């Protein structure tokens, strides 16, 4: 009783502690194995996602890769997609009209006080004709030398306005998910601007629970996990082995893995009715080994779509909402720790931040303590709604 009285008396002085509960979705070189994706989530993405994607040549690599999967005979209609949404996944290619066609050309502040691609996205999403659109993607051409902080700040403007709980009226019933993206290799190696820029974007997405299509990471590794960015390497998968730009990991991998599904998707080798991946922007002519760059990115797109549709990516079972001690049960010990955490987070760490954000609003504060108190008193009368946590 004394413990509960103390808790009640201290509730009013609790601080608001960010929970960082919503896990980031990072789509990188580890997300290119189609066999990992359950069929049901491929179907769910086709049924529920409506994507608008804006890009120029480098960004087209994703679409070229998706077309390779779509046209590969062994897959049938499994990876069907259409620009109009008439069949398969609904992806409106180059679907965000505006002053500038990609992030690189739109790296400035326009008359609305934001980047032109934010203005273009707002114009698209504010039209009731586009209330079905629930995923927005913008890609870079060259990221080299661009203002990455400006990019992140302007992406966050869109997130704050149109994502779940956003300030724009359409967010209440038609929320939108926004995909961040890194930029392609240009032979700089790890000491160059591009690597630093990509790392800044990655860290931002990890810290803020964002969705990232890691364009750069996907092309930095071959399918066996060998890393090439530090050789250095370029956007066509060329890299320096002995002399400047003398090798290509896509060509080498295909030569060493003839007859594999990935090699056949890339080259069309011994596949009746299929001549390989079509010409991949900046990467090679149709069927060349380095068009694997597009194939891998197309595979990763489907991995991302399944995640956006609700697939957990095969992650371990989520923790129990309210179980801030991590002992597998919810009791007054959890309530005391949650209270102490709100007063002094550093001195009273909890097992998993997600489990303390009881109302799922992104913060741990007085409301979460009150909900947990109510739940302990009357479990059937209170709902625990931690983001990405089981009850």
Language-model-derived ranges and their functions:
Residues 7-15:
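Bacterial N-terminal signal peptides
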Residues 183-224:
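Substrate-gating cap/lid alpha-helix
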Residues 316-391:
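Cellulosome-associated attachment modules in secreted, modular CAZymes
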Residues 25-134, 285-286, 296, 300, ...:
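N-terminal carbohydrate-binding/catalytic regions of secreted carbohydrate-active enzymes
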Residues 222-273:
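Mobile gating loops/cap/lid regions near enzyme active sites that modulate substrate access
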Residues 252-316:
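Extracellular low-complexity, Gly/Ser/Thr-rich intrinsically disordered linkers
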Residues 106-192:
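Extracellular-facing segments of soluble proteins and assemblies that are Gly/Ser/Thr-biased and enriched
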Residues 18-22:
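Sec/Tat signal peptide C-region and signal peptidase I cleavage site
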């Amino acid at each position: 009783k004394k413990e509960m009285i103390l808790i009640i008396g201290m509730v009013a002085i609790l601080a608001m502690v960010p929970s960082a509960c919503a896990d980031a979705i990072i789509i990188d070189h580890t997300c290119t194995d189609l066999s990992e994706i359950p069929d049901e989530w491929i179907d769910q993405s086709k049924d529920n996602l409506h994507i608008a994607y804006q890009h120029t040549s480098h960004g087209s690599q994703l679409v070229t890769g998706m077309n390779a999967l779509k046209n590969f005979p062994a897959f049938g209609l499994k990876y069907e997609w259409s620009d109009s949404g008439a069949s398969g996944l609904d992806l409106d290619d180059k679907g965000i009209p505006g002053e500038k066609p990609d992030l690189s050309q739109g790296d400035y502040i326009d008359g609305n006080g934001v980047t032109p691609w934010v203005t273009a996205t707002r114009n698209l999403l504010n039209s009731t004709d586009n209330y079905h659109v629930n995923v927005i993607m913008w890609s870079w051409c060259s990221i080299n030398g661009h203002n990455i902080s400006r990019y992140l700040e302007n992406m966050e403007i869109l997130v704050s306005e149109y994502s779940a709980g956003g300030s724009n009226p359409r967010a209440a019933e038609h929320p939108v998910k926004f995909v961040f993206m890194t930029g392609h290799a240009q032979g700089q190696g790890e000491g160059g601007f591009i690597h630093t820029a990509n790392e800044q974007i990655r860290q931002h997405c990890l810290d803020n629970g964002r969705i990232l299509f890691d364009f750069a990471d996907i092309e930095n590794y071959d399918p066996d996990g060998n890393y090439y960015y530090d050789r250095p390497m370029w956007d066509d998968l060329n890299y320096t082995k002995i002399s400047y730009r003398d090798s290509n990991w896509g060509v080498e991998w295909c030569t060493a893995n003839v007859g594999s599904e990935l090699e056949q998707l890339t080259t069309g080798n011994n596949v009746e009715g299929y001549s390989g991946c079509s010409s991949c922007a900046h990467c090679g002519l149709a069927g060349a080994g380095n068009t694997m760059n597009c194939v891998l990115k197309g595979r990763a797109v489907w991995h991302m779509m399944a995640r956006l549709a609700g697939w957990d990516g095969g992650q371990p079972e989520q923790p129990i909402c309210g179980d801030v001690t991590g002992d597998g049960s919810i009791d007054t010990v959890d309530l005391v720790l949650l209270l102490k955490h709100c007063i002094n987070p550093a001195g009273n760490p909890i097992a998993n931040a997600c489990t303390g954000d009881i109302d799922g609003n992104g913060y741990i504060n007085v409301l979460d303590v009150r909900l947990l108190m109510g739940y302990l008193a009357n479990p059937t009368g209170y709902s625990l709604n931690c983001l990405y946590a089981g009850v």
